[in-house]
């Protein structure tokens, strides 16, 4: 699909977690198109280099920082190596579905670590600096699973509902100092080729009767990151094709 190039993020630095593929990569590319310098986070240096090269090929600025978001020391190092961050996109996430009674505790703990604890400690490290400067934007990437029940989705849905609760609390804590905090609750999005049938099945349940392209969600994220959304904070924006409305 077509992409839009603006310049309203010139001079700003954005950190996008999980930015080496799928939705995170689309977000990183669009933020760069809008003028931001992007810190691309991921675990795989090869994929990170590919994303950085894709951004630079379009005339953007980017660098890669590797980190394991299930490791608290790595999270703190990621924040330090990112430097001054004006836009934080907590996109990285993991998911596993399964019956509650049979759900493995180690899998549950890892989902909580990556999906909830990592955003918490990145905000803890970076939001005070934003507040001291009087501006900043934090965008948390959630899912319809945070508000719609799915069989086997209790653990994953809980992590996304928690992230949306953090958005509200961080709004109360940081927005008086000029830091805007919002959530994008994404619907089914084509991010992994091997799960296309799943996306299509869930997409058929939406009002638009289709799944989203990553770029469609990325446009919502970059809007919230920009001055065009200067009066928007504490919101959970449902970019879900109308799934939660019907």
Predicted regions and their residues:
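Residue(s) in the substrate-gating loop at a strand-loop-helix junction
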Residues: 143
């Amino acid at each position: 699909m077509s992409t839009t190039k603006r310049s309203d993020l010139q001079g700003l630095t954005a950190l996008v977690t999980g930015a080496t593929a799928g939705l995170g990569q689309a977000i990183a590319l669009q933020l760069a198109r809008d003028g931001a310098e992007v810190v691309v986070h991921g675990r795989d240096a090869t994929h990170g280099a590919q994303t950085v090269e894709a951004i630079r090929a379009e005339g953007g600025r980017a660098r890669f920082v590797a980190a394991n978001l299930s490791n608290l020391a790595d999270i703190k190092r990621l924040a330090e190596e990112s430097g001054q961050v004006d836009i934080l996109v907590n996109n990285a996430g993991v998911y596993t579905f399964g019956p509650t009674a049979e759900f493995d505790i180690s899998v549950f703990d890892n989902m909580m670590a990556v999906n909830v604890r990592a955003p918490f400690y990145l905000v803890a490290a970076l939001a005070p600096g934003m507040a001291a400067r009087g501006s900043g934007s934090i965008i948390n990437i959630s899912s319809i699973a945070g508000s719609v029940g799915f069989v086997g989705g209790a653990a994953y849905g809980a992590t996304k509902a928690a992230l949306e609760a953090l958005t509200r609390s961080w709004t109360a804590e940081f927005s008086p100092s000029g830091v805007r905090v919002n959530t994008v609750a994404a619907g089914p999005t084509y991010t992994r080729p091997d799960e296309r049938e799943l996306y299509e099945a869930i997409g058929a349940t939406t009002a638009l009767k289709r799944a989203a392209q990553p770029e469609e969600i990325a446009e919502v994220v970059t809007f919230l990151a920009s001055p065009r959304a200067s009066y928007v904070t504490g919101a959970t924006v449902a970019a879900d094709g109308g799934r939660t409305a019907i």
